[in-house]
Amino acid sequence: MSDPVQAFKTAILAGLGYAPEVIEPGRFHRFATSERPNDTAGWCKQFDDLRGGVFGCHRQGIDETWSAAERVTLTQQQRRDLARQVLMATTERQARQRQQWADNAQRFAQVWGQCVPLVPGDPVTLYLKRRGFGGVWPLPDVLRLHRALPYWHGTEKLGTFPAMVAPVVTRDGRTVALHRTYLTRDGQKADVPSVKKLTGAAGPLAGACIPLHGPARGCVGIAEGIETAMAGWRASGVPTVAAYCAGNLAAWQWPAGVQRLVIFADADMAGREAAAALQARALAARLQCEVLTPSTEGADWADVLAAAARAPAAAEQRGAA
């Protein structure tokens, strides 16, 4: 391809599935690698001489180097020049990322500081009651209420809503993001484009989780979502954490001292694949590990719990009729 800028863009598309619309050589670009609003996980820089560039995705952990010519055709000097440019770009990217992480940490620390512990009858406890957790008290302490959290869709503020807020925490105890579930005052899901959202990260998210409970007697369970993890805990008594997505379930780093792992998998392709990946890692580390999956395709354990909670009420109505 004669146009090196277009060739670089084509390589980014092939590697990430997304690319910036405009690439200006010599400048760092951030761009979306998903359909999520405000996603800037992708990054790239084409060098001024147009002979090379770097690109990747912070969320996926991808870091690639591109050369306009086949590496085997480069002279030793050209290889040295490319390596020098890659090193300079890497240093610049890492500095930018550290600053972005620091900015994100400051923003979500402010949000967390505005949250309050749950009390019966607040929007979060009403929401969880609707999800089948009525009568469960105390609820996990990491779940908090924000009384009026702004909701942004792109650059548009759609309003403020009560929200269930939970920290995403690394194995060494660092909070790297906040998970938010937007609600109404009576505990319904808010009428917003995405009810559940993650803040910008303050560090790598891979392997982190929402620590609803700590391990007990060397045993811990994990599920994708908060409600799914809580359903697994309520049904089995196994203390659970939430991975917040299938990809992070597969990459989860269990705490030191864990000897038995229970995976409450979602009954879909992504859920099964993530559970299988985590189980393979756990077994390789000589942990006891079992995967529990709902029998209904597409269901998760929160769905199973909700259906079980509805069954007695339906039976009572039939008896009254």
PLM regions with names:
Residues 1-130, 269, 273, 290:
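Non-catalytic accessory segments of DNA primases and related replication-initiation nucleases
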Residues 1-5, 64-67, 188, 217-221, ...:
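TOPRIM fold recognition
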Residues 15, 130-134, 234-235, 284:
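Residues at alpha-helix termini
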Residues 29-39, 147-155, 299-304:
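Short, solvent-exposed polar/charged micro-motifs at secondary-structure junctions
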Residues 117-122, 134-142, 176:
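Short secondary-structure capping/junction motifs at helix and strand boundaries
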Residues 134-159:
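Short, basic/aromatic recognition patches
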Residues 152-256:
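Phosphate-handling DNA/RNA-contact segment within nucleic-acid enzymes
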